[in-house]
Amino acid sequence: MDQNELEQLRFPVGRFQWIEEISASQRTELIAVLRQFPEQLKKVVENFEAADFKNTYRPDGWTAAQVIHHLADSHMHSYLRFKHTYTEDTPTITPYDEGAWSCLSDGSDHDVQASLKILEGVHHRWCQFLDAFTTEDFDRKYYHPQLKIYFSLNQALALYAWHCKHHLEHVKNCKITA
């Protein structure tokens, strides 16, 4: 497999592109991505066989199950980061080791039902929360100490909408086709 093929498997929707300014209509579209994501993911996996959850989306990549558990972990973190940023002045968030978490017993279990339920609940609450934001609320920022950058909630929203699409394609790529 050459580097271009590997890059396509790693980033099936392309790498994340930072957006400095986000319009109200773009923000509405990004929130719609978050709102629709749990149902889209459920539809992708509803016809998975047990073996499909054990497949990786690329060589040395996570299994479909690990990706789904990662999504639950990551999106819980993001939702809480939004809440901290809304209620605190430029909080420093707590990063976590995604790779290590994916190897824990709950992150590598092939039964993904609990993580799908987490995503459904978190995304419902997250979107309900975002729907009440003003334009200025999205300008609030948090600091990511591992990356050493400040994220506005606009940027974080764009990142997590991309994250949904990115990993949805990974999960699709794990399905065994006859």
Regions from the PLM with identified roles:
Residues T28-R35, A65, H69, Q113, ...:
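A generic "alpha-helical surface" signal
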Residues E21-I22, V33, V44, T85, ...:
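Residues that form generic nucleotide/phosphate-binding pockets
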Residues Q26, W101-A114, Q146-Q155:
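Acidic/His metal-coordination segments adjacent to aromatic residues that form catalytic metal sites
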Residues A32-E39, V44, S102-D139:
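Acidic/histidine-rich alpha-helical segments that form the ligand environment
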Residues I22-R58:
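Short, contiguous, helix-prone interaction/anchoring segments in small proteins
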Residues Q26, V33, P59, T63, ...:
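Alpha-helix N-cap/loop-to-helix boundary motif
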Residues M1-V13, Q17-I19, F53-G99, D139-A178:
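Short, contiguous alpha-helical
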Residues Q40, V44-N47, A51, R81, ...:
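Amphipathic, soluble alpha-helical interaction motifs
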